[in-house]
Regions:
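Conserved small/polar residues in nucleotide/adenosyl-binding loops
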Residues: 153-160
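Long amphipathic alpha-helical segments
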Residues: 83-152
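Leu/Val/Ala/Ile-rich N-terminal alpha-helices, chiefly Sec-type signal peptides and the beginnings
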Residues: 4-58
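A very general structural signal that marks isolated residues within well-ordered alpha-helical segments
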Residues: 93, 160-161
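N-terminal entry module detector
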Residues: 1-3, 91
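N-terminal interaction modules that seed assembly of large macromolecular complexes
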Residues: 53-98
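Alpha-solenoid helical-repeat scaffolds
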Residues: 18, 33, 37, 74-81, ...
């Protein structure tokens, strides 16, 4: 096996490859893809990381329990929806303030395009309705100039509502 410099770079600097993928976002469609992918990644890392930490070595066995898997699926959609809301607001706030992108109504359009796609992919109806309600509530009061500089999770958690 022959290693060249490119292979070595991919192995040693994977973050460069990950971040360079999004460095050249030039269209609203690319923003949509970014929001969808990042929300999925955050929710997956958050939920499965939490479960693995809490259950320890038994986490593998728990994935054989159908009731447990059903509960994980419900939780997955709720965490994803919360991530989707935060990521959408963060991205459009950043674009508004830092890139002079004034079409903040696109946030609403993109959010519901993604949410409706996920509903067609089997999103839990309760998670869908809850996300719709929370997004609309926050959308009407968001300060586009400052949101991206605030702590992301300043709103009450789902269990507080």
């Amino acid at each position: 096996m022959k290693l060249n410099l490119k292979d070595l770079e991919k192995y040693l600097f994977p973050l460069k490859r990950i971040f360079s993928k999004y460095r050249q976002i030039r269209s609203v469609e690319q923003v949509k893809t970014f929001i969808q992918e990042q929300s999925a990644q955050v929710s997956q890392m958050t939920l499965y990381g939490y479960l693995k930490t809490r259950m320890g070595a038994k986490h593998v066995l728990m994935f054989e329990d159908k009731d447990f898997l059903g509960s994980i699926n419900i939780a997955k959609w709720h965490v994803y929806a919360a991530s989707l809301i935060d990521c959408t607001f963060f991205c459009f706030s950043f674009l508004y303030k830092e890139k002079n992108f004034s079409k903040t109504d696109q946030a609403n359009k993109i959010f519901f395009e993604i949410l409706n796609t996920e509903k067609a992919n089997g999103m839990n109806l309760d998670a869908y309705e809850n996300a719709t309600k929370k997004f609309n509530s926050r959308y009407s009061t968001i300060n586009w100039s400052t949101y991206h500089n605030c702590l992301l999770y300043t709103s009450p958690s789902p269990r507080d509502s």
